[in-house]
Amino acid sequence: MKENFEMVAKTFQGLEDVLAEELRGLGAENVEPGRRMVSFEGDLEMLYRANMCCRTALRILKPIHKFTAENTDELYERAKEFDWGSLMTPQSTFSIDTVAYSDEFTHSRFVTYRVKDAIADWFCDRFGEGQRPGVRLQDADVMINVHISGDRVTLSLDSSGESLHKRGYRVAQTEAPINEVLAAGIILKS
């Protein structure tokens, strides 16, 4: 029996219902549209299928740790509680992308630094000083997404790598190209 888990597909505002229908058509379960995203459940095969076949998704995320935090110190402590060794080793590289809609967390870059510090300190506490994964902005082994809404924090794995709109036919960008995800959404809505 395959084990289902929660996933989140990010999209543009206004395309949530179109993406939800696409996911249902691919066999996703418990599909729930939200604000610029659609949550759903499925197994590993569904994760791959969503990345390959969804025309109106920008990214497919897999939530790994949810918690509440009132400030950046609490964010650091709660992020440090996660077993980061289950995702990477001290030889791995990682990157963090942060989106914050909160009165308390107003600087997404500072949030990124605090989560990065929590991950680095988790490894240093277990493997010794200097034994931690490196940060790499491009082509990291593990891509982490931090989403904050109010005091609710979700840490997710980004299974897509680059934004899915870049998987199209273009070799190079032209002066004013239309995003492939947006174009697909417009066609599907018409």
Regions found by a protein language model. Give the residues of each.
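Accessory substrate-recognition/RNA-binding modules or partner subunits associated with SAM-dependent
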Residues: 2-142, 150, 159-161, 165-166
